Amino acid sequence: MQEQYNPSEIEALVQKHWHDNKTFEVTEDANKEKFYCLSMFPYPSGRLHMGHVRNYTIGDVVARFQRLQGKNVLQPIGWDSFGLPAENAAINNKTAPAPWTYENIEYMKNQLKLLGFGYDWSREIATCTPEYYRWEQWFFTKLYEKGLVYKKTASVNWCPNDETVLANEQVQDGCCWRCDTPVEQKEIPQWFIKITAYAEELLNDIDTLDGWPEQVKTMQRNWIGRSEGVEMTFGVAGHDKSFDIYTTRPDTLMGVTYVAIAAGHPLAEIAAQTNPELAAFIDECKNSTTSEAELATMEKRGVATGLFAIHPITGKQVPIWAANFVLMNYGTGAVMSVPGHDQRDFEFAKKYGLAIEAVIKPVDGDVDISEAAYTEKGVLFNSGEFDGLDFEAGFNAIANKLVAEGKGKRQVNYRLRDWGVSRQRYWGAPIPMVTLADGTVIPTPADQLPVLLPEDVVMDGIQSPIKADKEWAKTQVNGQDALRETDTFDTFMESSWYYARYCSPHADEMLDPAKANYWLPVDQYIGGIEHACMHLLYFRFFHKLLRDAGLVNSNEPAKQLLTQGMVLADAFYYINEKGARVWVSPLDVATTEKDDKGRITKAIDKDGNELVYTGMSKMSKSKNNGIDPQVMVEKYGADTVRLFMMFASPPELTLEWQESGVEGAHRFIKRLWKLANEHVNQANSEALDVSTLTSDQKALRREVHKTIAKVTDDIGRRQMFNTAVAAVMELMNHLQKAPQTTGQDRAIIGEALSAIVRLLYPIIPHVSFNLWNELGNASNIEDSQWPVVDEAALVEDSKLIVVQVNGKVRAKITVAADADKESVEALGMSDEHVIKYLDGLTVRKVIYVPGKLLSIVAN
């Protein structure tokens, strides 16, 4: 065995072995329990970052652990390779998105292999290949045939100068990123999938996701946003028109003092014809992008329309205002405003001098709405026939009256909106729909799929090449001239079903149901919590679509979800001569000074610039504080990087990158190597004989088996990889102090090392593979079994009892493990130190905590 640990040499040899032997390639095996472990696949941006490394290390640890449990483990990888960054890079690098993407895939694939991740590369997929998106297109046509796909106009960001649609990321301070022209909102036809048809099931089935974090489940519940309320009809004074409003608080209906409608509401458009101020306000609202998130913080503004709504119960007229906080695409585009009991309505009413009336008060007191709205539920008053009713009774009484008079209906609403899947970009899967000469829109026939995206294109940075090339859209369907759809799919489409394609990546159909149903659902899914409401909801939705198409037989795509925390690093900058911040990589910081608590107080970079330290923040390009994993692997080895990633923090919390911690991980592996080397060179041939062990030997062996039990639980159930590593480190400390003089001493060390290399194999697989062979095992570690706890070894022959006299420790005594109180008390009382401290005192009380403590009270 080599005396020195040489990671680059070991890792290259072990990785070659895995590659040559196709170690991680798997097939379906009905006789073995399966385990499908999946980390969210990466976008091929060019290089892996530490966030990737953390995600994929966690996945690999879980997969390798399950393999040693004897399971048939699938751990695939692929590339989420469509998307806007490729278009931007292609423009900047004067190339096309395809070659840039494929080059990045090759580079990053090599990086993943250098980190030793045990992927089944035979199942690798790239979503930008026709072999993949063909089936996505096919499935979309099937959804269309089932009535789950439709087209309607929706608002997009429009650059009037370039005459092109902009993604949200391409709008900077309200202007086009390329030409700085103010961006407008434009209504264009787009394709939607009816996720709302599954809203109730998506919501209810959250309760079945026992292995998902509560935070993610709560976020999805809120995103789906089920509410029970009443949709009621308001008339318009002096007109034969009416409009609907939905509310979850019909108990406050008697306090309505005005109605707010969206700028795009038909009533606003009518009123604007004779109201120039309103017309200008509507135009302004149309050209401002307003997300729901922005609504909460932006200034609330409005203009009176001059129209009045008729209260559905009292018949009273209340003014109708057009307001910038009401969205036409959310609800009915109109809200009843009760400023006495809604803070937003209150502030708007105060601003514009509108009436504020209280109709709800606390059960046990009066209500004061002079400074703010009273938003709690309570008892109705100033509400005519409904006075004195509580929330529930008031809700029901008012709802029943509206229903009886034909002016309303009870309704369950969802915040969730249908999924708009059209993107006016080039680098995405073409949407497989065509328009015939007579204007009829139909799906592309199956025998004409895939609709190929041309890859040999020139990007001008303005228009999608398939929109600019008028010939591309021309096609024929059933002998008729037709025009292809030139929009492409939202890239969330590809990531919504990739997990299922891995089960049969080469099938000449979307999925091979037999293979899909063997592997699915995913047993462990790993990815960032930032995907909670988009990807993870679409992922669940698509699984239900696949189920209803007869392709899978489970209801949910993943049993367990682990959301790993971000990776943070120190961030430094200096101010240059132009007064701008220049962010400096932590690797370029030459010297630092720290206070007595270890906090950085001064830093200087390699060029002598004095730096401002801003603390730990998420690794990012903008702060130049990303650490290249490849640099760390070349310096310390993949196993060290993996070990640090697992040890530095619990997986769901943020991880603070500290190179001193990486060095510590490296030292630990060298200690393990040294201990194994010493053991191998001692050539011990004596087999372990537990019947001959001394009490010290039994105690050491007990530590070995306690560690096996803890690590098994920490990795397998708790997923606390950091405490698993800490337990092995503690065991190593015991082993390094242990004597190796007798054959049984060495036999225990041998048993311990055999356990340790398997316990650490999921985390540091290269060194574990090597040491397993050096320890004399005939088969490779991948074919071994996870170490099993010897329950007999955990049984203690004796216990160390702490003896206190009047609350102070005066002695420690060793007693038989099964000793009763009387014998422990007798031993304690006869200890020379205890006798000394009891001299001249009378024992008043003796308390025995079995196996731990003997407490004597005397005076």
Curated annotation (Swiss-Prot):
Keywords: Aminoacyl-tRNA synthetase, ATP-binding, Cytoplasm, Ligase, Nucleotide-binding, Protein biosynthesis
GO terms (BP aspect): leucyl-tRNA aminoacylation
Enzyme class: ligase
Family: Belongs to the class-I aminoacyl-tRNA synthetase family.
Chain span(s) of sequence motif 'HIGH' region: 42-52
InterPro entries linked: aa-tRNA-synth_I_CS, aa-tRNA-synth_Ia, Leu-tRNA-ligase, Leu_tRNA-synth_edit, M/V/L/I-tRNA-synth_anticd-bd, Methionyl/Leucyl_tRNA_Synth, Rossmann-like_a/b/a_fold, tRNAsynth_Ia_anticodon-bd
GO molecular function: aminoacyl-tRNA deacylase activity; ATP binding; leucine-tRNA ligase activity
Sequence positions that bind ATP: K621
One CC-aspect GO term: cytosol
Primary localization: cytoplasm
Swiss-Prot/TrEMBL catalytic activity: tRNA(Leu) + L-leucine + ATP = L-leucyl-tRNA(Leu) + AMP + diphosphate
Tagged with keyword Coiled coil: no
SUPFAM superfamilies, A to Z: Anticodon-binding domain of a subclass of class I aminoacyl-tRNA synthetases (SSF47323), Nucleotidylyl transferase (SSF52374), ValRS/IleRS/LeuRS editing domain (SSF50677)
Motif annotated as 'KMSKS' region, chain positions: 618-622
Top-rank taxon, per record: Bacteria
Name of this chain's protein: Leucine--tRNA ligase
EC annotation from Swiss-Prot or TrEMBL: 6.1.1.4
PANTHER family: LEUCINE--TRNA LIGASE, MITOCHONDRIAL, LEUCYL-TRNA SYNTHETASE
Localization (cell): Cytoplasm
Signal peptide, first to last residue: none
Organism: Shewanella baltica (strain OS185)
